[in-house]
Amino acid sequence: MTTFTHINHQGEANMVDVSAKQDTVREARAEAFVRMLPTTLNMILSGQHHKGDVFATARIAGIQAAKRTWELIPLCHPLLLSKVEVNLTALPEISSVRVESICKLSGKTGVEMEALTAASIAALTIYDMCKAVQKDIVIEQVRLLEKSGGKSGHFIAE
C-alpha cells in the first residue's frame, strides 16, 4: 500500500525532504471548466465586459498563482519554474471556458500543484470578473491531466 508522503511516522504533517533526489525535467498539465450563461460568455468574447479583457486577466492570474503555490499550500516547496502557460478556450456549445495550465521545471519535485493552482486561480478570476453579471457561474472538473518526470513516472488522466 502506498503511504502519504507528507505524513511522518507519528502521523504529523511535514514537508518532504527532497534534498537527496536528482534533478529531472518535470512537467504537469491541469484543467478547469467555468460554466456560465451564453449571454455571459458572449459578453466576454465580444469584449463588452465592463471590467476589461477577462481572458488576459485570468491568464496573468493563473501564471502568478503558479509562481506562488508554495505560499498558498502549506507543504509545497518553493520552486524555480521554467515555464508556466495558461490557455483559455471558449466552448460556446457547452457555454463554458476551458482553462488549461502547463508548468515545467528541472528540479527535485513535481509541478502538479502549481499546474492545478494555475488552472484553479484562472477559473476563480473569471468568476470574480463576471460575478456582477452572473452569480451562479460554476467552476468544475478541476483536475490533473498529465505529469511527467520524477520517480513516479508518466501519468495521463483517462
UniProtKB/Swiss-Prot annotation:
One of its GO terms (biological process) is Mo-molybdopterin cofactor biosynthetic process. Homohexamer; trimer of dimers. Catalyzes the conversion of (8S)-3',8-cyclo-7,8-dihydroguanosine 5'-triphosphate to cyclic pyranopterin monophosphate (cPMP). Its EC number is 4.6.1.17. The active site is at 128. HAMAP family: MoaC_B. Belongs to the MoaC family. It comes from Histophilus somni (strain 2336) (Haemophilus somnus). This is Cyclic pyranopterin monophosphate synthase. Keywords: Lyase, Molybdenum cofactor biosynthesis. It holds the Pfam family MoaC. Substrate binds at residues 75-77, 113-114. Pathway: Cofactor biosynthesis; molybdopterin biosynthesis. One of its GO terms (molecular function) is cyclic pyranopterin monophosphate synthase activity. It is an enzyme of class 4 (lyase). NCBIfam families: moaC, PRK09364.1. It catalyses: (8S)-3',8-cyclo-7,8-dihydroguanosine 5'-triphosphate = cyclic pyranopterin phosphate + diphosphate. InterPro entries: MoaC (IPR023045), MoaC_bact/euk (IPR047594), MoaC_sf (IPR036522), MoCo_biosynth_MoaA/MoaC (IPR050105), Mopterin_CF_biosynth-C_dom (IPR002820).
